[in-house]
Amino acid sequence: MNRDEMYLSLGVSDKVLQFGEAVLDELKPRFAGIEEIAELNQAKVIGAMQKNRVNATHFAASTGYGYDDEGRDNLERVYASAFHTEAALVRPQITCGTHALAIALSANLLPGDEMLAISGKPYDTLEEVIGLRESPCSLKEYGVSYAQVDLREDGSFDFPAIERALNDKTKLIHIQRSKGYATRPSFSVEEIGQLIAFCKSCKPDIICMVDNLSLIHI
């Protein structure tokens, strides 16, 4: 039984099969682009592992408090090299994105500081972390205030409103890249880069935190 006969026996007509093949042909350039990105990212990771001289000893188990866990420390150096950052925190104890965001916020904000969300209201899961919903050990309870700048009606950043909202107490701005449950498009890396450059021009010492869903950049 050849392929066409097999599909026919499954109730798939020639018309449907030809349509599927036409769609695949149309998508070939997209698939090729994805494969190219994957290849480049793989090379980036391999380069980061070579730079940090990953070897068999880094995969050995450790005991005790983990102060000398060279495998863990080197893994974080590999992440930092791959993502071109000063440092990285990679731990199995960080169970989800909200957990990672809570760590980043708690580590960078002190009592009297202000967190400014400049892409509208963050995900619902952050409400208790910030203190928008009453919760023990929230940033609000810790003495950190919260302010928010909504996006424009077209889903773009409101630069004049952001500039007005920045003040002496503003320590950190929060940018949510994903559209979440909204209908706007997700922000591109270029758009976020322009936004951060603008915020830095207004307040050079501001900390810019980007919620990239599966990756947190500070």
Regions found by a protein language model. Give the residues of each.
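Conserved small/polar residues in nucleotide/adenosyl-binding loops
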Residues: 216-218
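Glycine-rich, histidine-containing beta strand-loop boundary motifs that form or position
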Residues: 92, 117-120, 176-177, 212
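Gly-rich Lys/Arg/Thr-decorated short loops/hinges at beta-loop-alpha junctions or inter-strand turns
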Residues: 54-60, 139-147, 174-179
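Conserved beta-loop-alpha segment that forms the PLP phosphate-binding cup at the N-terminus of a helix
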Residues: 88-114, 122-128, 132-133
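Generic structural signal for well-ordered, non-membrane alpha-helical segments
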Residues: 5, 9-16, 20, 38, ...
